[in-house]
Amino acid sequence: MFKRKSAPKIRLLFVDENNDLQSNIAEYFVKEMYGDLYEVSSAGPKSDCVDCELISVMYQLGYDIRSYTSMDFGHEDLPKGFDYVIFLEKSTYDRVKDDIPFKAPQILHDFGRKENFEKATDDVELYECIKQLVENVGEWCKSTFEDPEALKTMVV
């Protein structure tokens, strides 16, 4: 007869430098795994195209991010309020943590940048590097966001 009002979703913002790599992976996995718990966005201090190799590798793995777009912090489609801002690159965190336009607790988990792919000498090795990043971010998302209360313990 009466519907119980559900708790509001926790609002997350995933950040990497250009909103082109690991922030999109994290956004995808948290939406897929825990969309009932979280409202998820991603952005960066700068925007670029979402990494083409990432889109291709994720699609080959069965994860479709072809509709994702890169946004900077000032993008008009980016929500304005967040419960947590989650940096996925230490270098970006160190550079902008005090100047971001969002006043929310910050979490840092460093997955590095594309420089980690420099060891790839051909397309097969590049595929494996990106696949490993996707798997690492996916596993981290699975374990990290399962319990929303645990986020409080990760704030830096």
Locations of regions flagged by a protein language model:
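Conserved active-site segments centered on acidic
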Residues: 1-78
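Structural signal for conserved beta-strand scaffold positions within catalytic alpha/beta enzyme cores
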Residues: 42, 87, 107-110
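Residue-level detector of flexible, active-site-proximal loop/helix-junction positions
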Residues: 47-49, 92, 112-115
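Short glycine-/acidic-enriched loop or helix-start segments at secondary-structure transitions
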Residues: 24-26, 52, 93-99, 118
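Phosphate-binding/catalytic loops
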Residues: 96-156
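Mid-chain, well-packed structural core segment of small domains
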Residues: 78-101
